[in-house]
């Protein structure tokens, strides 16, 4: 039963819709509380338990996969249909990739002019939308050379989407019934089933009882896979990651690397095909132990991607650094990486005990000491599993965001400045939102799923130990946040003050010497000094990290140190708020007995005082703003650093990043100029639409403050006035039906949610327009 049982408020719980019929005509406060509170109680909300929940989650994956396949197919289809891929690969640096065309009967000459500049540089004759996703670079990297091949890929993706939908539908309808029938000695079917096909299937199966029971064991294994952690881990590690990575290494070796050397695996309309043999000796060197053979004869320095000029024959290398012409990682290095990952993960898939006892490790045996019992606890809490999964995927996404620019994997991606920043921005937002979700569901787990076993001491339960030490955890985070905040902001304000009074020479400038030493350990030279490391200075890696072009290890100074500590401040405050909210979800100094009051994730309901302000939801809500601002500081820093590098004005960042007004003036205001001038009464340009989005997103962002600051009293007065005017206007009074909808003030939770959504959406889209306008 949910801790937020609706009977507290006189409502009935619902299982088939977000808003039950009884509540649909009630106050917004009750409706929102009921939904936000009870939707997290998965079992009672949907009326399913145990393995059926796992099965439903598994089945939802098929739908998710189908959506992904269709989404990718749609993007690729439009590239093939009205993109310029075949033109782009002839000159990837100077040609802008087209995502899709635009046909609008309302476009006049002025409307065409808005997109005209883009079309002229993209090779298109119509109005188009430019692609900032990097998908062209990915297609080029993996060996696509024609629109025909893209169309074939689209068809494959669409077939996979259909297959995923059919698999999900089939399992959803028949799986439970078949399991129940196969597990008994007599035919089983639901009495009164309205599905005649299912009933007839059962009757048919009942006639063949001696045949079908042989399928019991595969079905039981199928169901066990959802609940057996070892089996599930082995499958995900080995089959999904291991074999997929190994297969991708095969594609790179047989298709992508030969294509990068002008040897194409083509599929023509008449059916002719050539399959590139990557090595003259095939697998003989592998079995004979001469693995170094595959790394011999690497591409020459004058190699041109996609041609035979300077091409080598190596297929698996460990060169490091980036190619000189594409400014991207060597495909042979990437193939080696995926081969190693595949082998490693397939081996790791045999670590955990699954079907046979005595073979592999049992996770429950590994989790000893303070971690004992964690496996059972995690298996019984979907919110704990989801929190851990979100945290893990968040870290992976963040790492991808960092690598996508510092070690660009796709050819010529580093030359496309807007795409480079857009991909970093994209992955930063996703990673941040996933981490917020991790903390939110950790709070729900502590409220709803965690129980203290009175028979065990606190030391035997890692979660209990964390809760017991939460005062120390919170106070340490608070101390770090205070230290970072006062010192960082103090230095910024000092520098602003002395600069404003005409004495910039008195600024406090602190060199990040420890970070510079770490850079030198990776091969970076320090102000013309000799290398600290023993790495061969002629290696590709050392050449890459000391290039002026690229962003692997950029020179850093006092402005970088201040930005680093400002970002650290934001990260620590965000974590402080989230940790305090999660750890205090069951009880705090202010209200130690929350858990005994039916206290939930959002709050304990309307009409019980200001308890929403001390709930885990409120901490999540507050931390979201710190997350958004911290992410903004991170991206501001990254973007400005990259802009000055690309424009060869690195001195601007070095001088202006040491005080706050420098950030406002030389980064935000200066780079907003192109959008501010996007359109006027005299005409428009190719940034006009982005300028309009810049304005509209600002308005959305500002609307969020109206909800966040005004709170309940303002809305109560406003709605009363609106309702009064409606009732005093005869025509509107006829339209208005108070029995269908009753306007009431927004609750605190509701107003904060609406305000947060406006703030976040406006914030993110405003900066997206800023990126395109300033970087273009």
Curated annotation (Swiss-Prot):
How would you classify this enzyme at the top EC level? oxidoreductase
Primary localisation category: plastid
Quote the record's binding site residues for chlorophyll a B3: 706, 714
CC cofactor note:
P700 is a chlorophyll a/chlorophyll a' dimer, A0 is one or more chlorophyll a, A1 is one or both phylloquinones and FX is a shared 4Fe-4S iron-sulfur center.
UniProt KW keywords: 4Fe-4S, Chlorophyll, Chloroplast, Chromophore, Electron transport, Iron, Iron-sulfur, Magnesium, Membrane, Metal-binding, Oxidoreductase, Photosynthesis, Photosystem I, Plastid, Thylakoid, Transmembrane, Transmembrane helix, Transport
Provide the reaction this enzyme catalyses.
reduced [plastocyanin] + hnu + oxidized [2Fe-2S]-[ferredoxin] = oxidized [plastocyanin] + reduced [2Fe-2S]-[ferredoxin]
Subcellular compartments: Plastid, Chloroplast thylakoid membrane
Q: Which GO terms describe its cellular component?
A: chloroplast thylakoid membrane; photosystem I
Q: What is its EC number?
A: 1.97.1.12
Membrane spanning stretches: 57-80, 150-173, 233-257, 334-352, 382-405, 421-447, 472-494, 561-579, 619-640, 687-709, 753-773
InterPro entries in the record, alphabetically? Answer: PSI_PsaA/B (IPR001280), PSI_PsaA/B_CS (IPR020586), PSI_PsaA/B_sf (IPR036408)
The GO biological-process annotations, alphabetized, read as: photosynthesis
Protein's membrane topology? Multi-pass membrane protein
Binding of [4Fe-4S] cluster occurs at 603, 612
Q: Which Gene3D superfamilies does this one have?
A: Photosystem I PsaA/PsaB
The subunit field of the Swiss-Prot or TrEMBL record says:
The PsaA/B heterodimer binds the P700 chlorophyll special pair and subsequent electron acceptors. PSI consists of a core antenna complex that captures photons, and an electron transfer chain that converts photonic excitation into a charge separation. The eukaryotic PSI reaction center is composed of at least 11 subunits.
Q: Which family does it belong to?
A: Belongs to the PsaA/PsaB family.
Question: By what name is this protein known?
Answer: Photosystem I P700 chlorophyll a apoprotein A2
* Source species taxonomy: Eukaryota, Sar, Alveolata, Dinophyceae, Peridiniales
